[in-house]
Amino acid sequence: MRVEHIIGNIKDIDATHLDIDEVQIAWYDTKKKIARLNSQNGQVIAMKLAQAPKYGLNNGDILFLDEHKIIIISILPTWVLCMKPTHWHTMARLCYEIGNLHIPLFYNKDTMKLQAPFEQPLQRILEKQSIAFEKKWCVLDSKDRINITYPIASEPKLIQSPHFSIKITQKGLN
């Protein structure tokens, strides 16, 4: 089966009369635009999205839908460090450390907590900085990922000049 676009999300439709088949993926695979996937019922899916979702695939995204069957994305749970800073300077230290480690950061609106995939170095930093956290087994959904919506500094635009030349010389040779 070939999938070229996401139809919607199961949360937005009534799927009580449909056979639900799930494609399980890890949170870090949700940004993929092209993938070969297998559903729990053995359906092979060649996903080649014409346009990648803005923030990635979400839990419950619909890959296929007809009158009898629906195939959805199911993001696998993983170990997560959950943090709820109580003061602005704790938040600043936390964001600095997470950014310094290049670890993605998620915000769970239901629990009002920041979440990061479990990494031992981050846990050690949180302990050393006395920042309260708990380790939980949960789903990291793309819709909850904190992203920079615009580039802080745009990439330089390089233009090759037709008058550009390089001369290489070696010292000491006559």
Swiss-Prot record:
Domain of life, per lineage: Bacteria
GO cellular component, one term: cytoplasm
GO BP terms, alphabetized: protein folding; protein-containing complex assembly; urea metabolic process
Listed GO MF terms: nickel cation binding; unfolded protein binding
Keywords: Chaperone, Cytoplasm, Nickel, Nickel insertion
Localization, UniProt: Cytoplasm
Family statement drawn from the similarity comment of this UniProt entry: Belongs to the UreE family.
Biological function: Involved in urease metallocenter assembly. Binds nickel. Probably functions as a nickel donor during metallocenter assembly.
NCBIfam families named among the record's database cross-references: PRK13261.1-6
Protein name according to UniProt: Urease accessory protein UreE
Origin organism lineage: Bacteria, Pseudomonadati, Campylobacterota, Epsilonproteobacteria, Campylobacterales
Gene giving rise to this polypeptide: ureE
